[in-house]
Structures are given as C-alpha cells and as structure tokens.
C-alpha cells in the first residue's frame, strides 16, 4: 500500500512514528507538506502536484494538519479524497472539529455532557453572559486558541468581567465556561481509533496553573477509565465522524464531561506514558478500510 502523510514537519514525533509503523508493516510512505501541494481541479483529469511533479495515486492519506493551516490543509486533503485516496479522518470532519462552537453544538445535540458554556462575539451585557454559565469562578477562552493559549481562569466576577472586556478589545470570539473545581487541574485524554479507546492518560496541570496541556508543562500518567468514560469518548469521536480522535474529558461530580475533541492528536505524550504502540493501531485501521472498493466508490 502507498501512504502519504500530510505534515509541515516530518521530523515531529507523531510523523516519524506513523512512518516507522507503516514501513514495518510493508507499506511505502511519503511525507508531504500540504502547503507545497497544488491542485488541478478538472472534471476530466484532476490531479495533485508537489514541488514540480505530478503525484501518483496514494491508497491512503494520514492528515497531520496543524490548526494554522486548516483551510488549505483540508483543501489539499479533499483533493486526495476526490482522487480516491482513503483519508484517516476526512477533510470535512477535521474542519468540523476545528470549529469549537460547531463541535460543542453537535456534541450537545447528541446528548453528550459538556461543561456549561456560553459563546459570544462582542457581548453587550458581560454580566448576563457570566450569569448564563453560573457565575464565577469561570474559564474564559478565545475560540481560536490551542494548547492552552488564550485560556484564563477568572476566580471572581470582577476578574471575569475584566478578562471578557479585554478579549472583546481583540475583536475575537469569546467562550465562557463553568470551572470544574473538583477536576483539580486534571483531565483525561482518551485516544480513540475507530470504535475503541486504545489508550488513556491523565494529564495534570503544573503547579500554579489549571491548564493540563502537556505543551504547557503538565504531567501525564496512565489513566484507568470507567465504562461510562469509554462510552462517552467513543460517542464523541463518532459524533464528529473522526476515525482517530483525542477526546479530552473532565471528571466532574455529575459525571464525565467532554472538553474537546481533537482531530489530530499528538502521539508522543500518550505513547511514551502508556507504552502502547498507537501508530501501528492507526496503520492497521487504514489496512482494513483503504480497500479497492473504497477507491472505486470515491472515483479513484
């Protein structure tokens, strides 16, 4: 099988592991920078070119598309899909997951428990927005933020109003969310492949912070998850139509709450913490689904 990995940096841990796992299972692998792909959109002879050459057909494509290049990265992935390549996460699912507002609306519609959340662009009544989510303490986020950037814990009403007013000055979309105190700065990252949680870790915020992102200096340990947490993680990934997803869960007194569904979860922290070969599980999923029938169905 011929597999393309779409990534701006082939030296990243996740890309290297996926490449190694695919090669170990006998596949040919090429890492392509999606921003260097250019496309001929033609009903008779569509194609993808890369650095001066027309690319051959790939049986499957693994998208490792960063948030900053979502628009063009998913456009390039769509072209591969149109040419019959099986995507490990479809372009439409990635775009959907990157839209935090749409994601939360879809999850809520499916009855998946979330922290109480309010979203606004430039709220005229900051006080009402705060009341809507139950008052302080609360978390204020920029909708476009990633890896804990643009996330502030406002412990008092006055602090919340000040942060919201400051974010409003950025002309940005603002997300206001109840603070789950009992989580104590921890969350659970469940790595879903297909209909299975293949690994789970607990991420704990560093001292003096409440954000558990490993990129922000948080620590990780192996997590033992409950059947309810396993079920909600799989349901969240399925709701977003993702074959592979990192589902972040908070343990609240009222039960597990989904914080986020990540369409391009990093493998380094979770593989090194659990010792589980997740990359090979992803390649095996591709082997089962990147079939000749799929290629013919999609026009490749």
From Swiss-Prot:
It is an enzyme of class 6 (ligase). Mn(2+) 2 binds at residues 260, 262. An L-glutamate ligase that catalyzes the ATP-dependent post-translational addition of glutamate residues to the C-terminus of ribosomal protein bS6 (RpsF). Is also able to catalyze the synthesis of poly-alpha-glutamate in vitro, via ATP hydrolysis from unprotected glutamate as substrate. The number of glutamate residues added to either RpsF or to poly-alpha-glutamate changes with pH. ATP binds at residues 141, 178-179, 187, 211-213. One of its GO terms (molecular function) is ribosomal S6-glutamic acid ligase activity. Binds 2 magnesium or manganese ions per subunit. The gene is rimK. This is Ribosomal protein bS6--L-glutamate ligase. NCBIfam families: PRK10446.1, rimK_fam. Disulfide bonds: none annotated. Keywords: ATP-binding, Ligase, Magnesium, Manganese, Metal-binding, Nucleotide-binding, Protein biosynthesis. InterPro entries: ATP-grasp, ATP-grasp_RimK-type, ATP_grasp_subdomain_1, RimK, Rimk_N, Rp_bS6_RimK/Lys_biosynth_LsyX. Mg(2+) 2 binds at residues 260, 262. Pfam families: RimK, Rimk_N. Residues 104-287 form the ATP-grasp domain. It comes from the Bacteria. Mn(2+) 1 binds at residues 248, 260. Mg(2+) 1 binds at residues 248, 260. Belongs to the RimK family. Its EC number is 6.3.2.-. GO terms for cellular component: cytoplasm. GO terms for biological process: protein modification process; SOS response; translation. The lineage of its organism: Bacteria, Pseudomonadati, Pseudomonadota, Gammaproteobacteria, Enterobacterales. PROSITE patterns: ATP_GRASP. Its cofactor is Mg(2+); Mn(2+).
